[in-house]
Amino acid sequence: MEMVINLLLFYSKILVVLLLFQQISNQPIKPLWYIITPFLYVLLLIICPPVGYFAYFFIFIAYNIYRNRYKSKILNIFYGLYPIIVDSLLGRMLGFYVFPLLGVYVFNEASLSWYDILIELLVFPFHLLIVKSLRLDFNEIKEGFKRHYFRYLLLLINISMLVYMLLVSTFVIYRDKLANADIWRGHINNFYIILFFV
């Protein structure tokens, strides 16, 4: 049963990241790809888990650079990383803070439950709520980048997202060897939520 939950979790994770990617990049994704892409990713995870795990972090960057070859690499990297990082941040925020308010504790990533899938499916609506509340417009980022307003800021954001990805992955991979890995991951999550949304 745990394997089924795990596969459904990864399927829903890719689905949510695709929705986030389309929202911020304004690149249309055909509805069929919302079915095929998560399925192919789950298949890759079954065949070769390490490749599937690391491909998750870089597939959207590679896709963006391939599709927009003659446009800014910094913007392509931003569009590739942002959905993955925001999915991770908001998912952990829901798991660490919102669900415990409801009496549901899902701190341990080693044991999965149906709540993990529910959390994943709530990430996109939660992101929409934050974007609407803060009145964020991703088209303004694109326009500002064309005029060189955000170039260095976006470079710093990309570096910070890569650092987040590296730190969280390290704590997940070495959770058995590092004392208080879950607590440190929570602190990193808090810091990056403040950095991204405040």
Each PLM stretch: what is its role?
Residues 2, 7, 15-29, 47-178:
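Juxtamembrane segments at transmembrane-helix boundaries
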Residues 176-188:
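Membrane-interface helix-start motif
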Residues 182, 197-198:
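Signal-transmission coiled-coils
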Residues 122-125, 189-197:
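Alpha-helical membrane-embedded segments
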